[in-house]
């Protein structure tokens, strides 16, 4: 059975190893916690269709390895990404301090208008927190990022992170800031959207033929 959707967006999940990136992806796709998760080697992939602002959007999500030895491999997957979850662990100052490097890579290597949401993961471990909500919120504001704290364990704000990112991309499409037909935008029209685009064009062509212009 073929899938019907209006748009396809390429997403990345980036950040240091051990921040729970694979668990976030698994919680989003499967609606359950992946308790046997190991560090990603290279890149993992998942996809899901979501409803956003009366549109069906298929997200193709690339979960990249956080270890430095895989960076040269994973950077090749940045090209043409429309959105990204930039993930740190609220219980690890080290993962937070690395955010600037990940952000630089994303903005240099992905599409020029990539939409990024900062995710402070492991919100369920608040008692072990090393990074405050306020300082992460300030970092997000200074770098023009959206921001949520998430828990891959409980599912809190996991779907919301992907939906918020997709919604902002849709808003940019509607405003003309993003063009799905531009090479490397990380966005493609789905069958449903293409049918809507072709219908007015077909009607216009038929009108021209009828008037003999």
UniProtKB/Swiss-Prot annotation:
Reaction catalysis annotation: GTP + H2O = GDP + phosphate + H(+)
Location(s) in or outside the cell: Membrane; Cytoplasm; Early endosome membrane; Recycling endosome membrane
Residues given in the record as Mg(2+) binding sites: 22, 40, 63
Pfam families named among the record's database cross-references: Ras
Residues that bind GTP: 18-23, 37, 39-40, 66, 121-122, 124, 152-153
CDD domains: Rab4 (cd04113)
Segments crossing the lipid bilayer: none
Entry keyword set: Cytoplasm, Endosome, GTP-binding, Hydrolase, Lipoprotein, Magnesium, Membrane, Metal-binding, Methylation, Nucleotide-binding, Prenylation, Protein transport, Transport
Lipidation (S-geranylgeranyl cysteine): 211, 213
Principal location: membrane
Motif (Switch 1): 39-44
Residues recorded as bearing Cysteine methyl ester in the entry: 213
Cysteines paired by S-S bonds: none
One GO cellular component term: recycling endosome
GO MF, any single term: GTP binding
GO terms classed as biological process: protein transport; Rab protein signal transduction; regulation of endocytosis; vasculature development; vesicle-mediated transport
Stored InterPro entries: P-loop_NTPase (IPR027417), Rab4 (IPR041819), Rab_GTPases_membrane_traffic (IPR050209), Small_GTP-bd (IPR005225), Small_GTPase (IPR001806)
Name of the protein in question: Ras-related protein Rab-4A
